[in-house]
Structure formats: structure tokens, C-alpha cells
Amino acid sequence: MIDIDVFIVSMVFISPILFASFVLLAGNKFTINKIFPVISILISIFCTILVWEKLNLSESKVIEVNQIFYIDGFSILMQLMIEIVALITILYSPQYLAKLYSHRQNKFHLYYSTILYSTAFMNLAFVLNNLFLIYIFLELSTILVIYLIAFNLQKEDLKASFKYLLFINVGILFSLLGIILLSYFTGTLIFLSNISFYVASLPKHIALICAVLFIIGFFTKSGLIPFHVWLPDSYSESPSPITVFLAGAVTKIGFYGIVRTVTVFSFHFQEIQTLVIILSSLSMFFGAVLAFNQRDLKKMIAYCSISEMGFIASALVLNSYIGILGGVFHIINHTLMKGILFFSTGILIFAYGSSKIDEIKKSFGNISWVSPMFFIGALAVAGMPMFGSFLSSITIFFALTESGFLWTSIILILSGFISGLALLRTAIFLFWSKKEQNQILNKIQLPASMVLSTFVLTFLLIIFGVFPEIIYPLLEIATNGIIKMSH
Amino acid sequence: MELIFISILILTFFAGESKNLRFSVYCLIANSLFIVTSVFTMGFTYNITSLYWIAFLDLLVRVFIVPLFILKSIKNRIHSEIKPTISHPLSIALSIVVLSLVYHFMGIFKTMNLPQVLPSFACGITLFIYGLYLLISKNDTVKMVICFFIVENGIHLLIISLIPHLPKFIEFTLTFNFIVAISFFLYIILRLNEILVKEEIEKLRQTKAIHRLEE
């Protein structure tokens, strides 16, 4: 690779760092606050697409630079997804913050720069080759998000962010311990380009110890049961755009870690595959069951999210093309579904100041845009046809059945049904059930940016469901990248 | 060398089990001084110059900056920790068992003849496991940060044991992450303390107002 290519790869993460620093230094100047973050993310997206083009032209479908960078299709997919989530989060935020967080107006520049820094470190982690360095930047991006969760500085926000920081930091230290043990027993540094070779050469008991450490670390990061304790509180207490950022970007870091470590182990050791699938089934089932009785809309969606993430984790350890393909596709669909649901909830909070179902119902007025989008999100969670989530769920279902995990595929269908039912029941209660006679229906004006952000995600979810061939080239290159690295 | 590691474990035990938070922090400072000594000694014994730099950084971060942060966070509150989930005598007994058993068990790794792995590995693993045990058993937020410090010390010693194989900047970057994490922890604790103090004052005012009305 020539230097210009290194420059393009670097710009993917340097651009958000530079612009974040500008925003941080410039303070709360209107144009800089709102325009710079968008420009920086657009530059990142542009550079990622250029790298994707380079990757398509290369024979091996992997770009390696001096043992520093390792870029395959999965890196590109993750980068694009995180950049789009960051962009939509930034576009959704201004009106939301202006109304609900006006008391923190003098810190808005910190809010935007933290999103940019976090995006930059994630982007950097997705292209690195050395496992230690990947860990360092994943951890750094995770820690920075604390500021966003605790942005409101109220008691409950601070408690939720303390829980997040404690669980995530300690949890992810397990994965660092896994990396240390792996290096200790192989006597060398572990890179993505050589991890499969060294894992295959490990004695079984050592491999199992390392894999369990990675599972604890990255399952905690993704918020899968039984390491999910931080997730519902963090989702419900943070500002709605940040909830989308958490669900669409931060928890996905855990899946990146799973793909780069646990998937490799599962390809060589059947026991790891079984262990992960058992844990994922627990997440699928209990996530859905716990969602059912929640009275806080955000917590309900958070538990549904845990259930859905179980689908992804179970698919990513299957030693088959369709399994990995389904898992990767569901990562994207999960981001879109949770984005729609949390953004819709954000609009309700914007209008009524609460995410409690009963309180919203009491003061519910006339919001024309939210109900159809929330319904689409709920139907997609239930795995209805016409949405991308249907295709990915059904792919995972067939992959699990083919690999001999019929019981998991039954749990998958069941939990999808329970989650969908919980959300649809709430949606019907909120939007369709009869209102009290004396209730005044106010027409509420919603900011265009908030509605448009939600609409874009809804549109993408439907488009990927009806025309999956649009996203397939990216999914294919990502799946082949994962399989190539793991074998 | 062995004596230094045993001193680290004993001081960690005092830091973890002491009910007085201020005393816990002082134990941590002494503990960190021993960690600095161990890193420096390993640098000297195995002739690895980067360990001198790491020892210097440890002195700055683990002996001065982080303990100062923690001391600041307990400035406006009661110095004894909130009652833990496990009773104190049982916790002390469990701590002794965890520390001695794990350290003894991890001695097995020394027989593995791994090329150029420094001897801090067993101590690192022991601190990591002991810190996790403490984290589960404690309820006080500041004590939890102290436990996190212990877990991190464990990871630090583990990384040090692999230093001959690692690019040198990895340890520096990890230390940077550690400082960022601790800063956020203490930022949250300070903010929480402020809110709790405000709530207490508000409660007191309301009680006084009720008393006045009754009179």
C-alpha cells in the first residue's frame, strides 16, 4: 500500500479527533457546535467508502499495513455503521438538548466532542491489528461515554453511570486478562492476522480459560445476560440520542470483540460454541421475559435489546457462512430497530417529559409521526416480514437448526414473539386505546430533525427488508472477512 | 523479590479490609510504593530500561495522583465505609484464604519455563482475583473505586510480567486509560456526594419547618 492509502485509512479516525478538538476549544459557538461534528463524520464516511473500494480491488480482501492495520470487510461494516449512528445522533440532538437539557447549555460542546472522540477511538480500534491496542482504544471509547450518560447530572443518571463504569471497566478487564494469558502461553504478541494460528496451537484447557475470559469481557460490553446489569439503567437514564448511540455503537464494540476473539475460539473448539449458544439463549429468553412487565418504555426496549443481542451472539459463533451472515445482518438491523424505538421514545419524552408508560398515557396528545414509526419498530422486533430483521432472524434460525441447535432456534422464535408482543401491547395502549373524555388533545409541534432522523432509520429498515441485495455486498465481504480470519 | 510481592499482598489486604477509608488510601499509597520498587527492581535485575520509565510513571500516578483524587472524594463525608454485604470477620477470613490460596496456586506458573516472563505474574493474578472478590462484597462507592484500583494494580503487574514481549507504549497507554477511568469515577462520586448533601440539607429544612408548624 502506498502512503496515500495510509492517509485515507488514518483520516477515518483523525477527522473526528481533529474536529472534536476544534469543538472543544471553540466552546459553545453555534455554527461550530452543530456543523463541525457533521462535517467530520461525513469526511469519515467518505474515507471509509474509499477504503472499502480499495478492499474490493484487493485480491485477498484484507488490507494489512506493517502489522499496524488489519482491515477486512467486517472492519468496514462496523466503521460505516458507527459513523452513521454518530451522524444521526448528532442530527437528532440539538432540539432535544435545547428543550430538555437547557440547564447544561454551557456544556453542549463537550457533549458533541465526546461523541466525536468516542467515534474516532472506535473507528481506530476497528482497523488495528494488535489485540492489546484494540483493547486500549475500545476501552477508551467506552469510558468517554460515561460523560454522556451522566450528562443530566441528576442522582439517577450519576448512579447509572457509576454502575456502567464499574461493570464495563471491570468486565472488559477480563478480556484484557484473556489477551495477557494468550500472549503468556504463546510467548508472543497476538495480532488479528495470526490469532487463528496461535489459538489452534493452544492446549484445550488453556484455550478454554482464555475463551471464557473473552466471553465474560465482551458479553459484559455487549450487555448480554448474565452480565447485563449496567444496561437497562444506562439506557433509561441517558438522553435519548445517547441511548441510540449506546445501543447502536457502544454495545456493538462488544460484538466486534466477540468476532475477533470468541468466534476464532469457537471455530477451533466446539465447547466454546456450545457455551456461547447457551448464554445467548439465556439472553434471548430472559431479556424478552423481563421486557414484558416494564413500566418504563426505555427499560422495556433495553430488555428487548438484550434479547435481540442474544440472536447475534449465537449466530456469530456458528461455524457456517449463513450463521455469520445472519449475525452480521442482525447487527445492522438491531441498530436500526433500536434506533427507531429509542428515537420515537425520545420524541415522546420531548413532548411529555417522561418515559414512564403511565405518565405518557395520561398526558398523551396528538403526535402524528411517532405512532407509525414506533409500530414499525415493534413489528420489526417481532420479526415480521418486510423488514430487514425478518431476513436476518430467519437466516439465524436456519443456521442454528442446521448446526444442531434446534432448541436455540425455538427459543429465538419464542423470544422474538414475546419481545414483539410486549412492544406492540405498549404501542396499542399508548397510541390506539380510547382516551378519557375530558382529555384535551393538543397538537404538538415536533422538530423536523428529530422526525427525519427517525424516518431515515425506518426507511433503511424497510429497504433492507424489501431489497436486501442493496446491503448484501457489504454483508458478504464482512462475512468472508470473519471466516477468513477465524480459519 | 518474593518479599516485595508478599508485602504488596499484605498491604492490599489492609487497604481492602480496613473500615476507615482514609487508612485504606494510605495503605494503597504504601502498596503502590512497593509496586514501584518491584518494577524498578525488575528493571535493574533483567536490565530493561523501559521499566525505569514505567516505575517513574507509577510513582506519579499510583502513589500521588490517584490517591490524592480518592482523598479529595472522601473529604466531605464520613470516613468509615458503608456496611459491606459480607460481615467484617468473615470477610477478613475469606480475604486471607483468597490471597494465600491464589498466590500459592499461581506459583505453578513459575514452573512453566516460559521465555522471558517476569516474576510479577502470580502476584498480578492474585491481586486481580482478590480485587474482584472485594468489589462483589463492598457497598461503598469510594471503597469500590479502591477495589477497582486493586484490580488495576493486578492487571498492571500482569502486563509488567509480559514487558519483554510488548511494545513499550502499551503500558503507558493503559496507564492513561486508568487515569481517565479513575477521574470519571471520582467525578461521579463527587457529584453524587453533592446531591446527597443537598438532599440531606433539604430534609433537615423540611423537618425543622414541620417542627416549627407543630410548635
Which stretches of residues belong to each language-model region?
Chain B
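Alpha-helical transmembrane segments of multi-pass membrane proteins predominantly involved
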Residues: M1-E215
